[in-house]
Amino acid sequence: MQLYVVTWRSLCFYLQVRAAMLPRAFRCARRSVARCNHTQASSGRTTSFGFKTVPEEDKESLVKNVFDSVASKYDLMNDATSFGVHRLWKDTFVDSLKPGRRAPMKCIDVAGGTGDIALRILDHAREKYADRETSVQVVDINAQMLAEGQKRFKKTMYHYSEPCSRILVAHVNSPTAPQVSFHEGNAQELSPEQFKDNTYDLYTIAFGIRNCTSIPAVLQEAHRVLKPGATFACLEFSKVGNPLLSA
């Protein structure tokens, strides 16, 4: 299995501004943390949530509360807080993977609710390689984020109205399989009936793995659903250890 992990220097200003734009969501999250702090003693295991440390068992619901609050404004918020730079990062990320080069590819985009990465994958395959068979299954734990993805694809050439799975299917005049579908699911525990072993050529997760409670569980599931020799690709913020690169 090939491994692509694209990391970028942590942008403290970006994160601070982003946090400032979500006061209501984070106030709700802080109240939730306060209400459930008593559970920490029961397990003793903690994990990060933004700039806080919270009990492991509470992180999933806290993340859901935040994204429920910002789903309709998520893409606009990313544009405002990164001055549009997040689009360049995502373009570079997808371009480096060359989806469609070996058509058709079966892809899974996890934590990809609004369809940002899925749309780029399909556009790249079509525009660079005239590939209209590559497909993407978008998975997200948050139904409201998936709903935003539906809205986005309704404005594209990939949309048609016949439903599939739990959310939506879209395609490009294909008589066989649809090119994109949206599914509610947990990256740490993908349904083995729906997401079968050794199925996908490409697994992507962009700015999502930090929101997962157990990264090892996410990686284990990614390994399970990917074909032998397939590609795992993660786009995420990180600190650069090499002082020459971080200067």
Say what each PLM segment does.
Residues 105-192:
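Class I SAM-dependent methyltransferase SAM/SAH-binding core
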Residues 216-228:
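A short glycine-rich, Lys/Arg-flanked "PGG" loop and its adjoining helix->strand segment in the class I
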Residues 231-247:
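Conserved class I S-adenosyl-L-methionine
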Residues 140-141, 214, 237:
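Short beta->alpha hinge that forms the Motif I/post-I loop of the SAM-binding pocket
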Residues 201-215:
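A short SAM/SAH-binding and catalytic strip from SAM-dependent methyltransferases
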Residues 73, 83-106, 120-124:
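Conserved alpha-helix/loop element of class I SAM-dependent methyltransferases that forms part
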Residues 23-26, 33-65:
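N-terminal auxiliary segments of SAM/dcSAM-dependent transferases
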Residues 188-203:
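A short acidic, Gly/Pro-enriched loop at the edge of an enzyme's catalytic core
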